[in-house]
């Protein structure tokens, strides 16, 4: 496979999978999920690779699903004659081959540990993807959240539920409030937050330590933990969440909102959504990620 929207780079025992649409905040487009799953499989099959690092190029990890153009780029999967088809949407989101969550979960299923490195914006589907990694380390000023809680979507990977206790899971599910990397670490959503200047070195240091452990040992420990969460109903929660997500993308309110994004602009739609809360697009500069914090492609960093 030739990668269009990700970058795959191996440095010794580490495989870097980098979301590579920096001009668009690495928002998710149809090829990205196929390429992600393929790259994870490539790292799994490479016996020299011990650890996978997932990151985003440019100013952000991932700005969520790309819905410019009214989400029509997904019509091949969810529409008939240009109109939303509930049956096709249901088939798409619940299929192991085409569903968004099963492709995110290639990170979870990988026998090799996955470290997700988060900076900038990590929202919506981008946060669902990030949290499927085993260990998540973020910059302190990263902004992580699920704005779809307010309009046009629903939890589908379940990680926001399983990583948090009931109180925070409910609060963030109902408000869609963004949390900084620092707060995400404090509430246990992610493992650690560090200043951006230390982020890449922090991730590399942990990856090198994990790479010193036999791969079979890591695989067995990961499998035991994963199985415990499967026993708690993770897969059924994901199936239910995916179906709910397909419905909530197509309520009258959601359709009016996505039409506003198509007719006026994505910026106008998210401003309407976020205005009462004063976050995401409407946050003050102090509550937004520093736009100067940029992650290069691994090959560029090594060359530099």
Pin down the residues of each PLM region.
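C-terminal alpha-helix plus adjacent terminal tail
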Residues: 1-11, 73, 180-181, 212-304
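Terminal peptide-recognition signature
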Residues: 17, 21, 35-36, 54, ...
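Catalytic-core regions built around general acid/base machinery
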Residues: 35, 39, 99-111
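Conserved CoA-thioester-binding segment of acyl-CoA-metabolizing enzymes
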Residues: 1-57, 294-304
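Glycine- (often His-adjacent) and acidic-residue-rich active-site loop
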Residues: 56-106, 265-266
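Crotonase-fold acyl-CoA enzyme core
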Residues: 6, 105-218
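Short, active-site-adjacent cap segments at secondary-structure transitions
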Residues: 59-63, 123, 225-228
